[in-house]
């Protein structure tokens, strides 16, 4: 089994959401660097990222950006054809910043911040994965197929522009030309298995790679995709 390491540092970590809205987790207030990274992503994969909606998450920064910096970031992202539509819930300073920028505060992130202020409750077990869903026919361009709480097995082709999503693993016995996203609810143990790998995008628990990030020697091969230390790994199946 050949293994390809594609680790790289990012100024902003982009995670693909379950409903197509990505979260841009800001890791630096170096605005030119952030804008350049996002511009490069749009250039490499315009069909995926041009005019894509993103939620800005400042939660990993040591302090909340000032209004001037935040405005420069929002304006720069828009100029790069990336559209900030909301800010992730955070501190009172984040609340004020969202009002000043005219962007809504997304409450789905509220629990994450409140857990940091109170004792964590006993961990709850992950809902069990149910019997898998099987798709016999081709998933065509523009179609989206979602397997909730289970694995997804596709016995045919996933066309370019099509999207297949599963909370569990994804098995594709034909050609993958579109997008495949496993572990959609955040389970990083899930994998993607594909007989003919020509994907536009692959993602495990929100971490993703696009076509231009995938080594050419793996295209057209039978591969498996998994997550290791928050990085996507791809290996040919012997």
From Swiss-Prot:
Keywords associated with the record: Cell cycle, Cell division, Septation
Superkingdom in the source lineage: Bacteria
Cell division found in the keyword field: yes
An example Gene Ontology biological process: cell morphogenesis
Gene3D superfamilies, A to Z: 2.160.20.70, 3.30.70.260
A family per Pfam: MinC_C
Keyword Cell cycle: yes
Record family assignment: Belongs to the MinC family.
NCBIfam families per record: minC
Record function comment: Cell division inhibitor that blocks the formation of polar Z ring septums. Rapidly oscillates between the poles of the cell to destabilize FtsZ filaments that have formed before they mature into polar Z rings. Prevents FtsZ polymerization.
Quaternary structure and partners: Interacts with MinD and FtsZ.
Designated name of the protein: Probable septum site-determining protein MinC
Gene: minC
């Amino acid at each position: 089994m050949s293994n390809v390491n594609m680790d790289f540092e990012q100024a902003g970590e982009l995670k693909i959401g379950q409903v197509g809205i990505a979260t841009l987790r800001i890791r630096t207030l170096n605005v030119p660097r952030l804008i350049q990274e996002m511009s490069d992503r749009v250039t490499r994969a315009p069909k995926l990222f041009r005019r894509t909606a993103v939620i800005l998450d400042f939660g990993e920064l040591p302090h909340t950006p000032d209004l001037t910096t935040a405005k420069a970031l929002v304006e720069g992202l828009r100029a790069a054809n990336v559209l900030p539509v909301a800010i992730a819930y955070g501190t009172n300073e984040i609340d004020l910043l969202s009002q000043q920028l005219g962007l809504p505060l997304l409450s789905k992130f509220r629990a994450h911040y409140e857990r940091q202020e109170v004792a964590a409750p006993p961990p709850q077990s992950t809902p069990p994965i149910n019997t898998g869903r099987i798709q016999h026919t081709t998933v065509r361009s523009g179609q989206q197929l979602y397997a909730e709480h289970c694995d997804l097995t596709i016995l045919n082709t996933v066309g370019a522009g099509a999207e297949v999503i599963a909370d569990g693993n994804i098995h594709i016995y034909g050609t993958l030309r579109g997008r495949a996203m496993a572990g959609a609810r955040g389970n990083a143990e899930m994998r993607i298995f594909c007989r003919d790998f020509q994907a536009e995008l692959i993602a495990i628990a929100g971490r993703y790679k696009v076509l231009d990030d995938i080594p050419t020697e793996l295209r057209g091969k039978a591969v498996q995709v998994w997550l290791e230390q928050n990085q996507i790994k791809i290996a040919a199946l012997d």
